[in-house]
A protein has these predicted regions:
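Start-transfer (signal-anchor) and selected internal transmembrane alpha helices
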Residues: 1-33, 146-149, 156, 165-166, ...
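Transmembrane-helix signature of polytopic, membrane-embedded enzymes
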Residues: 20, 25, 124-130, 151-173, ...
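Short helix- or helix-capping micro-motifs
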Residues: 29, 167-172, 199, 220, ...
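Transmembrane-lumen/periplasm boundary regions of multi-pass, lipid-linked membrane glycan transferases
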Residues: 32-35, 52-88, 103-114, 122-125, ...
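Short acidic/glycine- and proline-prone juxtamembrane loop motifs at membrane-interface regions
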Residues: 47, 176-189
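Transmembrane-helix motifs of polytopic, lipid-linked glycan transferases
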Residues: 134-158, 196, 200
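Membrane-interface transmembrane helices that cradle and orient dolichyl/undecaprenyl
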Residues: 158, 162, 197-213, 223, ...
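Transmembrane-embedded, aromatic-rich helix segments that form part
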Residues: 191-192, 214-216, 229-247
Length: 294
């Protein structure tokens, strides 16, 4: 029995076979990524992942003013860090703020996410820093399943349902994707939002609304937030807006007017400002403590 649906996978108002095949692919992808999630049995063999858990643990203890928080890990070298939730003045002071991770190889948002979920988990049970892998790794797995879905959407957009499903299936079974999903690192999140950014670029070209540029900026900021080395993604942003100028005049260069360029330039500026804002919110001390960041 088919269910009535207005979903993009529907055909004539009925859920098509494509939906069910994609659902199977996503379920298989999730199962592969969650299998063996406790692969290191708590020994934290991955150094970057270990740093994220331990720094987020120390930050959580400092924010909650736990006894001995200033003697926790990296905080021993930060005697000016003030315990408790920061006020506005403390928040913008790189030395006193408890939210400054003093560590920038990877995006600060990864640490903040762990602190946020730690505060929720602690409402129900005590948990140590390394046991937060039971939260971090499933989040990474879910992000990579989102990547599988985005691969389908892009493949479908470019070449049709068959290619979209084939690409999603290969991505679901890709060893490197499955491996990265077993670490709480930036790769799975950055890939997801990078693909989502490409989808948003396409959407912006089709709909040409200011809202679509805002969505594009948001997704670009989320792509860069976990890993600053993704900054080159801004190059396609420039190209896609220039393509939009040409598309508006159907490729006739002589019809390009200053007013048209200014209007589309304003859309591009909005996307850039939102992307920069998202990055600042997710990693404020990359700017406030820029000497340590660079």
């Amino acid at each position: 029995m088919a269910f009535r649906s207005d979903h993009f996978l529907s055909f004539g108002g009925r859920v098509s076979w494509v939906f069910y095949v994609l659902l199977v692919i996503l379920v298989v992808a999730l199962a592969l990524r969650l299998n063996g999630i406790n692969w290191d049995q708590g020994f934290a063999f991955h150094p970057d992942e270990r740093d994220i858990y331990m720094r987020s643990g120390c930050m959580y203890e400092l924010l909650t003013d736990s006894p001995g928080a200033n003697d926790c890990g990296y905080l021993r070298g930060e005697p000016d860090a003030q315990p408790g939730l920061p006020g506005i003045g403390t928040l913008f002071d790189k030395d006193r703020s408890p939210l400054n991770p003093h560590w920038f190889p990877l995006g600060s948002i990864l640490i903040y996410v762990m602190v946020f979920f730690r505060s929720i988990v602690e409402l129900f049970t005590d948990i140590n820093s390394l046991d937060m892998r039971y939260v971090g790794r499933p989040l990474s797995a879910l992000a990579d399943v989102g990547t599988v879905a985005m691969v389908f959407l892009l493949g479908r957009k470019l070449y049709g349902n068959g290619v979209g499903l084939l690409a999603a299936g290969f991505t679901a079974l890709a060893v490197i994707h499955i491996q990265n999903s077993h670490f709480f690192r930036p790769e799975t999140f950055s890939v997801l939002f990078t693909l989502a950014s490409f989808w948003a670029m396409w959407r912006m070209l089709e709909r040409k609304r200011l809202l679509d540029s805002a969505i594009l900026g948001l997704l670009l900021g989320l792509a860069i937030a976990p890993k600053i080395s993704l900054l080159p993604i801004l190059a396609p942003l420039f190209l896609v807006y220039w393509y939009r100028v040409l598309d508006e005049v159907e490729g006739r260069w002589s019809e390009i007017t200053p007013e048209l360029v200014q209007r589309i330039f304003n859309h591009a500026i909005l996307a850039g400002v939102i992307a920069a804002g998202v990055f600042f919110i997710s990693a404020p001390y990359a700017i406030l403590d820029i000497a340590a960041f660079v």
